Structure formats: structure tokens, C-alpha cells
């Protein structure tokens, strides 16, 4: 059915007036944009950005207006920044939820990036309204750390592309970067700022000034161990090495940077540490004399299956993947009507599981069970039934109100799965587009009209 989306896009492009405006099919595009604006902030902004990035939208004025709306709406997103598991690898299904690009910082920076292609002055004005990262301290129990790299990538892009020759001569790009080079208050900012400096096109004296500002801030910053251990070893260490190499290439003395880096490591490693951070290998080595002042708790995985009903369903799940002989069921065995009947019984039991005392555990655990079911169910009617059942549960779920990003993650993966198999998932595709939930319906229609490339979605699965 994707041919329909391509036909609509072709119609939008073909109906553009000489000035670039969409005429005949204007209502198709404008209806989607109007519906998007009525959604909660992050869903509205993301949908508008997808529309603004559509190749068929050649009307620059219309695109500009949509980008401005998306930028303003993005400020109301529930999540201020992207997040990731502190180890660098997803520890649970929902760690990926915070990498969907639905946080305020990512959405606003994306709007700025898109605006830069059509109006660099407006893009610069918009970026000036993006709040610089002020990152909350985390506890050892937190499994997710903040990722603000998009902000500093965008700052570097502004310095490189958002100024004319006179403004460059007046050192305005340098002043922009100087504003952020020394504004280091959390370990989560260290690597992004260092990389921003590495890629900056600057005169030697300007580079030295930024380097000095960054090193001075690095010498003073003291962050929580969870944020620190989420970047060292690994991201921060590599970024400092890259910055040192850039200093060598420019023949600039990096001793001040290295001294600040070593002082930073000593300060963090001798402070309060998290138990799982201390146990992690490899550890930065500063000698036997550097020991933690205290060793506290460890990260708590979210959405564990603790309730009796959840544990019961988890036990019953094994009958769908393991036969009486103790061996895993083959794809051929799962294609039988007998297995299909057991799946339907299990789906009925899953549907009867109502919310527990802990809404986070309930939503995450039930979503994980649906995800596991999808992975073991062969293509065909049973998989289509499974996705339809999941849709019914999601579209009436109150979890969306306070946990939009997490609620949308299974919605997003459901849309990706369904539209990746238009023949086998025809019923689910139609149900998604006709959903009573306005977010689900609009995003399904966007997927039909503006399908995302697999490279952009595979990491979410």
C-alpha cells in the first residue's frame, strides 16, 4: 500500500504553483499539519518536522512557518534531553524510548538545522532561544544518563554556516562558541563540548582561547558518579584524546588541558562512587592512592516483572516457545492451528491483566511481553492478530498522560513492524490509520505518506 503514499507525494509535487506553493492538493498537507498542531507538544513538533522535511514541500514560506511552529511546540515536551543507558548499551526495552528524538532539545535543534537550509539568520535567532543544557544531578539508582550531544553539534553547525563573511571577520562565530566552551557543569557535557572544539574552523588565537575556557571549566567541574561513569572510560576519554590530537596538529600546547583532565579524573574517582560503577572494567588508572570516599547504591532496572500476575504470565509464555520435550519449538510447529490456539488463549489472558499498583512496572512489563511475542510469532494471521491486540491496549492507555515518550515507544515499533510488511499486516495497518487515538492515527498516516528509511528505524527495534 505504500504506492498510495508515493502517489500523494507525487501529486503534491506536481500541483505546486510556479511560486512553489501547493494548490490542488493543499488540503491533504494542511489537514495533516493542522491535526499535528493539536497533539501533545513532542508529538506535534516531531510530526510537523517530518512534514517540513518532505521533498514535496517546495513552498519556502510554508516550510518556514511549519518549522517555527515545531520549534515553539517542542519547548513543551515532557523530556528536556535525550537519555541513554549509563553503560552505553540498552539495559531494557525502554532505554530505547529516550532515543526516539522526542525530547525538547533534540526537537528544537532539529528545527534549527532544517531552518538553516532556508534562512540562516532565522536559524541563528532560533538557536539563541534554545536553553543551554543545565543537567540535573543523578543518583546511583538511575540507570539512564543525559545525552546533550545534539546541542553542541548544532552550536558547531551554527558557527560554521550561520554567519556571513563580515560577521566571521567580526569574530561572531568565535563568540558563539565561547559562550558554551566554558559552560561545563556536568560530566555529560564534557565530550560534546570537546568535539565541538575539534570541529571548529578557527584562527589559532581563537582556538587557544576556547581551549583555555574549556580547560578552566574542566578543572572546576564536579559531577555525580552516575553521569561520570556514563562517559568514562569511553566517550569522554576519546573526546579528550581527539582534542589533544587537534592541539598537536595546530602546534598548540595541550598541557593545561591534560592537567585539567587528570585533576577531573582524580576528583571524580576519589569522591562518592556507585557500586556498579566501581565494579565496571576497565577503570581509569590514576594510581593505588586514589580511592572512593564512599561506595553507594547501583542502578535499578525499570519495569521489572515483580507482581504475581506478571510472573504468572511470564511462566505461561514459555509454553509458546518450548515444547514438552524441553526443546524450542520450530517455525513449522508455530504455524499449526494448535499453536495458534494457544497464542490466542495467551493473548486473552494478557488482555485480562489490568493495571497493578505500580503503573510503570505494569506498562513496561506488559509492553515487553508483547514485544517478545512478536519476536516468536511467525509472519501471517497470528502475528497480525497479535499486533491488533496490542493496538487495542495502547490506544486506550492512560500511561500516555504522564509518560508520553515511553508510551509512544511500543506505538512507534508497532507502526514500524506493520508498515514493513504491508501484505501480511494489512489489517493492522488499516486499524492504525483508523485508530481512535489521534497520535496513533496521525503517525500511521505519516508512515503511509512519508515512510521512514529502514536505517532510521532499525535501531529502535
Describe each region flagged by the PLM:
Residues 1-4:
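Positively charged n-region of N-terminal signal peptides that target proteins for export
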Residues 7-17:
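Hydrophobic h-region of N-terminal signal peptides that target proteins for export
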Residues 15-461:
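Non-catalytic all-alpha helical scaffold/repeat segments
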